[in-house]
A protein has these predicted regions:
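Short beta-strand segments within Ig-like beta-sandwich modules, predominantly Fibronectin type-III
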Residues: 129-133
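Aromatic-rich peripheral "rim/lid" segments of glycoside hydrolase catalytic domains that contact
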Residues: 36-128, 139-155
Length: 156
């Protein structure tokens, strides 16, 4: 587990995407193969990916992957769409809290949607937030343009 090495690698990819004016998508990462020694590395990588990319694909499939010690790093919340301009995504390694901020510049803005895996909740549900099924929560736009923020966390 080398946070400095991973930080340099991610910083280089983020800078490259900015230079090209493109979103950053990580095509493939992973293959921890159920190794419990990889829990820290998986959590660190998941945090870097959540904060710096528009998406990624984890590569590894074997029976019982859900029982792998690193699986909580894969089964995490994610913004599916935000009704405005994304400002920031922060994912704490422990206890696994995700915060998503965005600016709604028009009124009414489109609704924002977030994927919540089993066992996750929206901490401060903006008024009118509702479950739409299949682990998705919908957050309606605010009445006036401005900064929005939601916190997603494991249920107590």
């Amino acid at each position: 587990r080398s946070p400095e090495r991973l930080d340099i690698m991610m910083r280089n990819r983020v800078e490259e995407a900015r230079r090209m004016g493109m979103p950053l998508l990580i095509g493939e990462w992973g293959a921890f193969y159920g190794d419990a020694r990889c829990v820290g590395a998986a959590a660190m990588m998941a945090r870097f990916l959540a904060e710096n990319t528009v998406g990624e694909f984890y590569w590894d499939y074997h029976r019982g992957i859900e029982q792998g010690a690193f699986f909580p790093s894969l089964s995490r919340p994610s913004p599916l769409r935000v009704g405005g301009f994304p400002v920031g995504i922060r994912m704490a390694e422990s206890p696994g809290v995700m915060q998503v901020e965005w600016t709604e510049e028009t009124a009414p803005a489109p609704a924002s949607e977030f994927h919540l895996p089993d066992g996750w909740v929206m901490e401060e549900a903006p008024s009118g937030g509702k479950w739409t099924g299949a682990g998705t929560v919908s957050v309606p736009p605010a009445e006036k343009p401005g900064m929005r923020k939601v916190t997603l966390r494991p249920a107590s």
